[in-house]
């Protein structure tokens, strides 16, 4: 067995893999910029080499369709699954965090949200969405973020139907005498110790792959490249989507997120061309071949280090 196959199987078996989560990763990474639609049989072919059968795929697709994340259309005996409006919106929101090349710049301002008159259930749901967007809870009804744009937050509040129950404030960076207390509060409210530990686990899992990709370069087939890329993004996504992506000024020393991001970028850059080739080979839509990736694909991680024209030629 190839050393790359050994690594891939170890990654699959290390922790239980949710079908809905894995296929969400696949759609977001491999299909969202290629039309967002694929035949069920193509998905089964893409995942077969990882040990996931058609029943695994069908069950996950059924659940994602039931949740409104995927739409399904049937032509004859074939079923084609595509990202719904909801699925595409959530995918775009997630990829803005997943494929960042660096921490967000900060102008020293804070966005504060004070909720008024919300029942406990609604408040809990809104707080969950805001935390996913990078907010922290300074108090039961007070959320804060140093890096969110007001327009994005307003959209979220309107979608949740609570815009009239939330007061928005802007605050400047605190005086120097309160910065030590601020750092301690930030670490507590944003659970940075736990987040750092998750990044460390990701690094321990994927760092051994870096020398393997050099030692076994001739074994990096399109199928193996795709499997590596899917697992890489799947496990990185599970960590980075919980990261509030705080500005550099607020992070503790030796923040593992920096190393984890660069590790992900280095591996992704290495396997992306061949992975795209495999998706092109196996992927089929209701109108034939998958389209070439859109321009936004090539802006991932600050820009993939391969010319778009050359990559499109490679996958044909």
Swiss-Prot record:
Any matching Pfam family: PaaX
The region annotated as signal peptide is: none
Q: List GO BP terms, alphabetically.
A: DNA-templated transcription; negative regulation of DNA-templated transcription initiation; phenylacetate catabolic process
Ranges annotated as spanning the membrane: none
State one molecular function term (GO). transcription cis-regulatory region binding
Is-annotated flag, keyword NADP? no
Metabolic or biological pathway, per its Swiss-Prot or TrEMBL entry? Aromatic compound metabolism; phenylacetate degradation
Task: Specify the domain of life of the species encoding this protein.
Answer: Bacteria
Q: Which UniProt keywords apply?
A: DNA-binding, Repressor, Transcription, Transcription regulation
Role this protein plays: Negative regulator of the paaZ and paaABCDEFGHIJK catabolic operons. Binds the consensus sequence 5'-WWTRTGATTCGYGWT-3'. Binding of PaaX is specifically inhibited by phenylacetyl-coenzyme A (PA-CoA).
User: What's the family?
Assistant: Belongs to the PaaX family.
Q: Know the name of this protein? A: Transcriptional repressor PaaX
Please tell me the species this chain comes from.
Answer: Escherichia coli (strain K12)
Which lineage do the record's taxonomy fields give for this organism? Bacteria, Pseudomonadati, Pseudomonadota, Gammaproteobacteria, Enterobacterales
| Annotated gene | paaX
């Amino acid at each position: 067995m190839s050393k790359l196959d050994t690594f891939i199987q170890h990654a699959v078996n290390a922790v239980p893999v949710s079908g809905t989560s894995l296929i969400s990763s696949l759609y977001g990474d491999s299909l969202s910029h290629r039309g967002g639609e694929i035949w069920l049989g193509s998905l089964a072919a893409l995942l077969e080499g990882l040990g996931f059968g058609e029943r695994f795929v069908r069950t996950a697709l059924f659940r994602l369709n039931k949740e409104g994340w995927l739409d399904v259309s049937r032509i004859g005996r074939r079923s084609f699954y595509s990202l719904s409006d909801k699925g595409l919106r959530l995918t775009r929101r997630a990829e803005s965090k997943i494929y960042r090349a660096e921490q967000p710049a900060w102008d020293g301002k804070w966005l504060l949200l004070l909720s008024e008159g919300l029942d406990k259930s609604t408040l809990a749901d809104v707080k969950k969405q805001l935390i996913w967007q990078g907010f922290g809870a300074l108090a039961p009804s007070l959320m804060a973020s140093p890096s969110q744009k007001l327009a994005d937050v307003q959209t979220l509040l309107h979608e949740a139907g609570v815009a009239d129950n939330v007061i928005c404030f802007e605050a400047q960076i605190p005086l120097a005498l309160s910065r030590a207390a601020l750092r301690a509060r930030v670490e507590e409210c944003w659970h940075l110790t736990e987040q750092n530990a998750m990044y460390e686990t990701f690094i321990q899992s994927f760092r051994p792959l870096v020398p393997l990709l050099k030692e076994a370069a001739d074994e990096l087939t399109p199928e193996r490249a795709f499997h590596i890329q899917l697992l890489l993004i799947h496990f990185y996504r599970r960590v980075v989507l919980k990261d509030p992506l705080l500005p550099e000024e607020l992070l503790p020393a030796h923040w593992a997120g920096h190393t984890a991001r660069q590790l992900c970028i280095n591996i992704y850059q290495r396997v992306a061309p061949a992975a795209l080739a495999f998706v092109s080979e196996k992927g089929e839509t209701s109108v034939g071949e998958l389209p070439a990736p859109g321009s936004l694909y090539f802006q991932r991680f600050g820009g993939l280090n391969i010319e778009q024209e050359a990559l499109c030629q490679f996958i044909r």
